[in-house]
């Protein structure tokens, strides 16, 4: 599912970040729930990622996204309701109680804002959404937030201090960013009521003073100041807060210090391999982002991968690499701290480009227009990833997910 924020909004560090008290708890699991069904549109995912990271969307990618949307809309008018099951993608979100309201949020390790649809918006923009019911007495006077993308889309609003409950833990005075205005791109995405950012608080967009993420607010009250992500292939995943669940991974967890200099959970891989081929020595610096659907790697890496896929090509009319849906895709691995982290080939087949098409869109694409590699859900769905702040310095743990062959 999509997510929305590293923005072109000013993200400079302020002198301090406000923390809030919590009710003490221990450790718990948050299960995602299926919340809506939508058609996959590869070029639209690329466009969304570019906007999220403040980059311009090239005309050919936007045209491909728009064209695929039109083709799919036309298909909806036909009499045959049957479409390939892999053309659909469930939205897996997490229920969160904000104040007295239960909303379904996208947990996003690529942003640091907790923002929600609210009753401050025009009613027309709330259609299909659950939303936060504000209490004027809890408003942080003079505080605002704004998400701004290069194409003019975005969202903005006021800031409240309220209870936010995730699983068993309640932050009793969490900064909640209540939307007053959202662009059509957001309001039309009825699957998601907002997001809960899990990146570093240093890129929170609240002004005049940045606020802590929900995790930073509660981490001192957890059994351990960490969370682990288990996204699933064609299934709901989980987020574990305060503990590591050994039943969810195989082998050992490989730890590396995270590069948080830009506010993200960053790391550097020392190489990659395709299928059973030899490891190619190549430094790949990227971030882990649960709010990004696809996986973006250096252009040379993507080219090397698709060179091993019969019939694959970089198609400008589709905005990325495509291949025959019948093709067998090789596994893809990156090397982190000397250990291979492997994505099964079938995970890299994102979807047919349109209903009934025999051409499929790749789940791995070049990072050329983004400027950094992003390891999104295509990568994460085969992994158990630990985000650890135990020593005050962020580190990442990588392990193969239980039940996923490497």
From Swiss-Prot:
InterPro entries xrefs: Aspartic_peptidase_A1, Aspartic_peptidase_AS, Aspergillopepsin-like_cat_dom, PEPTIDASE_A1, Peptidase_aspartic_dom_sf
The EC number(s) this enzyme carries: 3.4.23.-
Main location: secreted
Coiled-coil segments: none
GO cellular component terms, semicolon-separated: extracellular region
Removed propeptide positions: 20-65
GO biological process entries: proteolysis
The family this protein is said to belong to: Belongs to the peptidase A1 family.
Function as written in the Swiss-Prot or TrEMBL entry: Secreted aspartic endopeptidase that allows assimilation of proteinaceous substrates. The scissile peptide bond is attacked by a nucleophilic water molecule activated by two aspartic residues in the active site. Shows a broad primary substrate specificity. Favors hydrophobic residues at the P1 and P1' positions.
Protein's recorded name: Aspartic protease SNP2
Biological source species: Phaeosphaeria nodorum (strain SN15 / ATCC MYA-4574 / FGSC 10173)
